UniProtKB/Swiss-Prot annotation:
Organism from which the protein derives: Penaeus setiferus
Modified residues (Serine amide): 74
Domain of life (superkingdom): Eukaryota
Name of the protein in question: Penaeidin-3l
Disulphides: 44-59, 48-66, 60-67
Keywords, in A-Z order: Amidation, Antibiotic, Antimicrobial, Chitin-binding, Disulfide bond, Fungicide, Pyrrolidone carboxylic acid, Signal
Iron listed as a keyword: no
InterPro entries named in the record: Penaeidin
GO biological process, one term: defense response to fungus
Record family assignment: Belongs to the penaeidin family.
Function: Antibacterial and antifungal activity. Presents chitin-binding activity.
Length: 75
C-alpha cells in the first residue's frame, strides 16, 4: 500500500514538474522585465574617436569620461 501511494505521489510530482499537471500561478516561469541594453564599457575609450554623441554623453555621465573636441571627439 505504501509503495502504491509513493508511486502515485512521484508520478503526480513528475507531471507538475513537466507542466502537464496543475497549471497554477506557481508553476509558471517568472517573466523578467525588458531591460534596455546599455552602452558597453569598451565603447568609452580614452581617445573619444569613433563613438556617437549619445555614447559620448553616456560615458560622461556614467563613468566621468567626458569627450571634448580638443581630445579628438568629432561628434
Amino acid at each position: 500500500m505504501r509503495l502504491v501511494v509513493c508511486l502515485v505521489f512521484l508520478a503526480s510530482f513528475a507531471l507538475v514538474c513537466q507542466g502537464q499537471g496543475y497549471k497554477g500561478p506557481y508553476t509558471r516561469p517568472i517573466l523578467r522585465p525588458y531591460v534596455r541594453p546599455v552602452v558597453s564599457y569598451n565603447v568609452c575609450t580614452l581617445s573619444c574617436r569613433g563613438i556617437t554623441t549619445t555614447q559620448a554623453r553616456s560615458c560622461c555621465t556614467r563613468l566621468g569620461r567626458c569627450c571634448h573636441v580638443a581630445k579628438g571627439y568629432s561628434g
